[in-house]
Amino acid sequence: MENTGSRELVIKEIKLFNKWSYDFIEVRDPSLKKYICLKPVYLPHTGGRHEHRRFGKTHVPIVERLINKVMRPGRNMGKKHLAYHIVKKAFDIIHIKTGENPIQVLVRAIENAAPREETTRIMYGGITYHVSVDVAPLRRIDLALRHLTEGARMKAFHSPIPIEEALAEEIVLAASNDPKSYAIQKKEEIERIALSSR
């Protein structure tokens, strides 16, 4: 017996949290393009498989890296499920506030909050000097994510504002390059110190 009905293989589009599409997300900063992973995933959880490879972090989805930064030592340490829900709710709030894809808003916030220059300590003849150096792209992303989550944590700590709202607000402010954002303030402070120690 022959089956005359043709079967079509329907591949659903992979969306983050089953809501946000990875299509048309652009990274404007050419130095960060290679290091911001926008590989489509349903659930941003790689289980630390990148850990033992050099530059393994470049293959971890950027949203998972944000989730991992939310999971800081102290109250939220090791609670990835809690951090996952914080970021998920924050993305919903970002979409309500801006009307844009939250992944694109996050990428824009990282580009704006990533410092280009910082200082390092060099010992020369028994005296320590602070010398201005360029920041590696991977470190730029790490610093931007750290400052975004630090700002949200500081805003929500001892405050009636939930962490989800604080994180969403911090990301939106950083995406619009607003000086009220903690991440933008830290970036400008780091670059100002680096400029003075050239």
UniProtKB/Swiss-Prot annotation:
Gene Ontology MF terms in the entry: rRNA binding; structural constituent of ribosome
Gene Ontology terms: cellular component: small ribosomal subunit
Record keyword RNA-binding present: yes
Keyword RNA-binding among UniProt keywords: yes
SUPFAM superfamilies: Ribosomal protein S7
InterPro entries membership: Ribosomal_uS7 (IPR000235), Ribosomal_uS7_arc (IPR026018), Ribosomal_uS7_CS (IPR020606), Ribosomal_uS7_dom (IPR023798), Ribosomal_uS7_dom_sf (IPR036823), Ribosomal_uS7_euk/arc (IPR005716)
Keywords attached to this entry: Ribonucleoprotein, Ribosomal protein, RNA-binding, rRNA-binding
Complex and partners: Part of the 30S ribosomal subunit.
Described function: One of the primary rRNA binding proteins, it binds directly to 16S rRNA where it nucleates assembly of the head domain of the 30S subunit. Is located at the subunit interface close to the decoding center.
Name of the protein in question: Small ribosomal subunit protein uS7
Taxonomic path: Archaea, Thermoproteota, Thermoprotei, Desulfurococcales, Desulfurococcaceae
